Amino acid sequence: MSHVRSAPAGKSGGGGGSTPAKRGRPFGSTTGSGAAAAAAAAAIGDAAAPAALVGPSLQVLTALSDQNNKRIVLALQSGLKSEILWALNALTVLSFKEKDDLRRDTTPLAKVPGLLDALLQVIDDWRDIAMPKDHTKPPRVRTLGVNTTLSGFGHENVEKVYSDTTTPSDDQTKTADSTVTKKRSAGFLFDEEGLFNVDDEGRTEKQQCAVAASNIIRNFSFMPENETVMVQHRHCLETVFQCLEDQNTEDDELITNMLETLVNLAPVLDLRIFSSSKPSFIKITEKRAVQAIMGMLASSIRVWHCAAAELIGRLIINPDNEPFLLPAIPQIYKRLVDLLSVPAVDAQAAAISALYNVAEVNMDFRLKLASERWAVDRLLKVVKTPHPVPEVCRKASMIVESLVSEPQNRMHLLVHENTFAEILTSEGKYSDTFARILYELTARPSNKVTAGQAIWGNIN
């Protein structure tokens, strides 16, 4: 999977040591090779330079002030390479946030009219422009920069030479309209769907702009003041879910940014927005959104299925989202239990966190989980195996305790009674939990028939 870049432009400019990327910090922002780092260095070195002496590609903003807001939005909407790169680099710096860093100078998206829409247009139009064509799909309509003669992306001059430059008269126009077969303009051969368009460089540059825009949206999603704006912005959520839907034809970096954006917004996200009266741009429904999440959960890429598991765990705690996730519970159950056997500790942690939340709110899930002996065995293995994050083992034991609380599950769980007793005597941290589990199994009135077989003796 490709390394996530924090800006579309910029070369390696330093050989200093790097620190590990943190959650809450853009991936690649600590390597010294991103444009954000270079731009920040330029801002520090030329802080006293007058703004009039530097062009749009050099001027670095230190805050989203009123005089800069409109200029950034217009730059994103221009379709010009120099303007878009300047705006994206500036926003990357402004949206950058260290872990646990309280940004007192942050400006909520709500106070920058049109900024979120401008970023979404860059993503919508250019997110897959450099990917191989799939001729089973209709051509994409791209409007960003369509009226710009020369934008600076790639090699644009070739098609201008071959395009028809003569303006037809009214009579010629009428004749052409009445003709059944029309002769296409030579410029068609060089446009995006044309036969001789080999401007891969321009396509790649545009797609990297979309990746950088997705990174900025991801950064903004870490700021609590932006949560409300983003979860109530239907176009934003539709774009994010459509990117997840098209994971096979998208840039890996862009998918990762969109998925992390959803994970950050999940605690306050209500899927009912897709059936609300808010204007829709892509026609995403609740069912399609859940299917997109399931596609990420089934992915073989570890970062994606871990994030998808975490996303499901956060979404289902909202009672309004539960009806949309219920049809996918069987697939969710199977995939989460499968992740428990993955050697990677982060995959186990994500699966346990999701299992814990789903088991807490859904009784059918608890019944299904307890009825599968191999699934309970994997949970107990997580409890018995030391984990770098003790909270994971604690949640695994609490999942087992929630299973015992269902009377229908006790007969299934009696099979594991010896293992429960072993953990009780050997794992001091979880002895209280497993003491309660054994008590539930052997001392409840519904279990008087099996109490004589319990290892604690007949306690009737």
Swiss-Prot record:
Q: Where is this region: Disordered?
A: 1-32
Q: What's a GO cellular component annotated to this UniProt protein?
A: SWI/SNF complex
What domain of life is recorded for the organism? Eukaryota
Q: Which UniProt keywords apply?
A: Developmental protein, Growth regulation, Nucleus, Repeat
* A Gene Ontology biological process term: positive regulation of DNA-templated transcription
Where it mainly occurs, coarsely classed, is nucleus
Know the name of this protein? Answer: Armadillo repeat-containing protein LFR
Please tell me the species this chain comes from.
Oryza sativa subsp. japonica (Rice)
**Which gene codes for it?**
LFR
